[in-house]
Curated annotation (Swiss-Prot):
Gene3D superfamilies: MFS general substrate transporter like domains (1.20.1250.20). Keywords: Cell membrane, Endosome, Glycoprotein, Membrane, Transmembrane, Transmembrane helix, Transport. It catalyses: N-acetyl-beta-D-glucosaminyl-(1->4)-1,6-anhydro-N-acetyl-beta-D-muramoyl-L-alanyl-gamma-D-glutamyl-meso-2,6-diaminopimeloyl-D-alanine(out) + n H(+)(out) = N-acetyl-beta-D-glucosaminyl-(1->4)-1,6-anhydro-N-acetyl-beta-D-muramoyl-L-alanyl-gamma-D-glutamyl-meso-2,6-diaminopimeloyl-D-alanine(in) + n H(+)(in); L-alanyl-gamma-D-glutamyl-meso-2,6-diaminopimelate(out) + n H(+)(out) = L-alanyl-gamma-D-glutamyl-meso-2,6-diaminopimelate(in) + n H(+)(in); N-acetyl-D-muramoyl-L-alanyl-D-isoglutamine(out) + n H(+)(out) = N-acetyl-D-muramoyl-L-alanyl-D-isoglutamine(in) + n H(+)(in); 2',3'-cGAMP(out) + n H(+)(out) = 2',3'-cGAMP(in) + n H(+)(in). Residues 59-83, 135-143, 201-210, 308-326, 375-376, 434-446 are extracellular. Glycans are attached at residue 61. Glycosylated. It comes from Canis lupus familiaris. InterPro entries: MFS, MFS_trans_sf, Tet-R_TetA/multi-R_MdtG-like. The gene is SLC46A2. Highly expressed by the epididymal duct epithelium. SUPFAM superfamilies: MFS general substrate transporter. Residues 1-37, 105-113, 165-179, 232-286, 348-353, 398-412, 468-481 are cytoplasmic. This is Solute carrier family 46 member 2.
Length: 481
């Protein structure tokens, strides 16, 4: 990375620049989150009387015996109903605070949204720890989730992370920087998920099962909060957009990927003497941002629905996973962060940004369709492998939008995007859980088939963006219609 933080002397600059890195906060937070997510699922499963499920799941990766009937179905419905309410609380409570935190971050201090959201993360992890330690009812977790949401939740945290990542990088390098943050998030989530099942089994045979797992989650969340408060520094804004573009041209392949979404860029690249830029003509920024929003929301519907149903799917026949297998399955999901990062580095050398977005959508849609027909554990991992580029669309859309807005509006716009995704995700979670309850005895893969359809449907607005992009490159600029 280039020297984006200025200091009084050359010796002090590298040290100051290291303190502007958001990656340690992202890594610690994601380890805490992956431990928490696995712990939440396993604790809730145990709370709803998982006596029938754990032993059979430990014996094999799939059930070879007769169906376990009503008790398993009742447990699945109880877990599903818990997550319906839980996801509603997690999704709706940030609406009261996340936008305000984004506004404060833009006008007061960039760390406000991150620090307040991390405080909420810590409180929710402490809530799960107390539930395990004191054997409280599962309804306590709704209150812990509400505290997390009132502090901004993931919407405020991730918007703050994206704002700091965008602010501290030049426009040319921003695409790779944001995907690198996602890579760190994926690696941390992979490590946490791999360890989660083993940590959960450290205290077994009584209500304290999961104590070690939840304590580790609280420790990581505490570290992230203290680091963001005491160590993290806000990076100084990178050079002006024009200079950043010039500097970025020296980075082979990866730089020009997202830049063509900016209508002004087509003016800069137009052949001299052919359609010179006209300052009086309006540029269709709002249209493109709206299309990107639409594509992101429809695609996120597919992703959220799949992610919400998958934990229930792997606990039930035909897979019937145990605690360790659940952790491994979650870890497999985090490898998508790694493969998507590598995909951006490779595809950006030969494809436009819209093409990369569509590749990611096809990857996820195909994997979700395969997931609908999974009968064995190895088939599950094959389906997950097909989803290897599933992260590219949302990350690329965020990067593209950052090129179309002013730096002073990063926090606000990213919060609006994240809240839109969160709000639609809440509705999706409720609908998908209800669909799963109705169809799990007839065709358990119904939700995955629906996600596949939505993923391919999301390609349409991105295709329109690609068409408009081709018009810019051909004619130099266009009028807003």
């Amino acid at each position: 990375m280039g020297p984006e933080a200025a200091g009084p002397g050359r010796g002090a600059a590298p040290r100051l620049q290291v303190r502007t890195w958001i990656e340690p906060v992202v890594a610690a937070t994601q380890v805490a989150s992956s431990l928490y997510e696995a712990g939440l699922l396993l604790v809730v499963k145990a709370s709803f009387g998982a006596g029938a499920g754990a032993g059979a799941g430990a014996a094999s990766n799939h059930s070879a015996g007769p169906p376990r009937g009503a008790p398993e179905d009742q447990q699945q419905r109880a877990i599903s109903n818990f997550y319906i309410v839980y996801n509603l609380v997690v999704g709706l409570t940030p609406l009261l605070s996340a936008y305000a935190l984004g506004w404060l971050s833009d006008r007061r201090h960039r760390k406000v949204a991150i620090c307040v959201a991390l405080l909420g993360f810590l409180l929710s992890r402490v809530g799960l720890l107390l539930k395990v330690l004191l054997d409280w009812p599962v309804e306590v977790l709704y209150g812990a989730a509400a505290l997390n949401g009132l502090c901004g939740g993931f919407s405020a945290f991730w918007a703050g992370v994206m704002a700091l990542g965008s602010l501290g990088s030049s426009e040319g390098r921003r695409s790779v920087r944001l995907v690198l943050i996602d890579l760190i998030l994926g690696l941390a989530g992979f490590c946490g998920s791999m360890a989660s099942g083993h940590l959960f089994k450290q205290v077994a045979g009584h209500s304290g099962q999961g104590l070690v797992l939840t304590a580790c989650s609280v420790s990581c969340a505490t570290f992230a909060l203290l680091y963001s408060l005491l160590v993290l520094k806000v990076p100084e804004a990178a050079a002006g957009s024009g200079q950043a573009l010039s500097a970025g041209d020296s980075v082979a392949g990866t730089v020009g990927t997202y830049r063509t979404l900016d209508p002004d860029h087509s003016d800069k690249q137009s052949v001299q003497g052919l359609h010179p830029p006209s300052p009086g003509k309006a540029k269709p920024r709002r249209t493109i941002i709206a299309l990107l929003f639409l594509g992101a929301i429809v695609y996120d519907l597919a992703v959220v629905g799949t992610v919400d149903v998958m934990p229930l799917f792997v606990l039930r026949e035909p897979l019937s996973w145990n605690q360790v297998q659940v952790g491994y399955g979650m870890a497999a999901g985090y490898t998508i962060f790694i493969t998507s990062f590598l995909g951006v580095l490779v595809f950006s050398r030969c494809f436009q940004d819209t093409t990369m977005i569509m590749i990611g959508m096809v990857s996820f849609g195909s994997g979700a369709l395969l997931l609908a027909f999974v009968k064995e554990t190895y088939m599950f991992y094959i389906a997950r492998a097909v989803m290897l580029f599933a992260l590219i669309p949302i990350t690329t859309i965020r990067s593209a939008m950052s090129k179309l807005i002013k730096g002073s509006s990063y926090g606000k716009v990213f919060v609006i995007l994240q809240l839109s995704l969160t709000l639609t995700g809440v509705v999706t979670s409720t609908v998908y859980n209800k669909i799963y309850q109705v169809t799990m005895e007839k065709f358990i893969g119904t939700c995955f088939a629906l996600s596949s359809f939505l993923s391919f449907l999301a390609i349409i607005p991105i295709g329109i963006v690609a068409y408009k992009q081709a018009s810019w490159l051909q004619y130099g600029d266009v009028r807003e219609t």
